[in-house]
Each structure stands twice: as C-alpha cells, then as structure tokens.
C-alpha cells in the first residue's frame, strides 16, 4: 500500500503545480503566462508597417486595443509601462523557457 502512496502523492503534486499554470512576475505585478503570450501576439500585430512611424509610442495603441488582455491593463496606468511591457515581451519571445522556470520572473512550474 505504501509503495503506491508516494508515487501517487508525487503525481498529484505535479498535477497541482501544472493546473495552477505559470505566473510571470514583474515588480508588484503578477500575470499568467497565457496573458503574456497574448500580449506578444498583439504587439506583433500593432508594429508599424511604415518605417517612418517608428517614432511614436506604441503603449497607447496597445492599451486601447480591444484585444489587450484585461489582466495586463493595470500596467497601462504606470509611467514605466513601456519598460514593463518590453520585459514581458522578452519572456513571451520564448515562452517555453518560462514554462521550465529559466527566468527568475516566472513561477508556478
């Protein structure tokens, strides 16, 4: 009986960790990795196609988009929103690295 108890508890622990998902933390903020992935997709759609338009800030465009994840909206109110979104985009570029907790900002593996 005890032979099966330990492996069962281990499997339950792994399942509980995976069910909670991966959390990305940046300062006072904490987001699901899924929201960060959506942000990356949205930023790729919003990148200007005309090289002359690179001077304008992209934050208002992102924050006002109807596809912008609700979970990330508090970032838009911060003066350093662009810096935070850049850090999140770095994580989103390779989400598999975050899923194995290679970044200190990621938790819940």
From Swiss-Prot:
This entry's Gene Ontology molecular function terms read: guanylate cyclase activator activity
Q: List the disulfide bonds.
A: 63-76, 98-106, 101-109
Q: Where in the cell is it found?
A: Secreted
The entry's cellular-component GO terms read: extracellular region
tRNA processing recorded as keyword:
no
Superkingdom: Eukaryota
Q: Which residues does UniProt assign to the signal peptide?
A: 1-21
Propeptide, residue positions: 22-94
Xref: InterPro entries:
Guanylin, Guanylin_sf
Which keywords accompany this UniProt record? Disulfide bond, Secreted, Signal
Which Pfam families does the entry link to?
Guanylin
Family statement drawn from the similarity comment of this UniProt entry: Belongs to the guanylin family.
Name of the protein in question: Guanylin
């Amino acid at each position: 009986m005890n032979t099966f108890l330990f492996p069962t508890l281990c499997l339950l622990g792994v399942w509980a960790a995976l069910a909670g998902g991966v959390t990305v933390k940046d300062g006072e903020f904490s987001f699901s990795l899924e929201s960060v992935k959506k942000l990356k997709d949205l930023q790729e759609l919003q990148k200007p196609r005309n090289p002359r338009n690179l001077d304008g800030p992209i934050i208002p465009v992102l924050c006002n988009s109807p596809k912008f994840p609700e979970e990330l909206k508090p970032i838009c109110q911060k003066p350093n929103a662009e810096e935070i979104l850049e850090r999140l985009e770095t994580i989103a570029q390779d989400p598999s690295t975050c899923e194995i907790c290679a970044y200190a900002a990621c938790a819940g593996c």
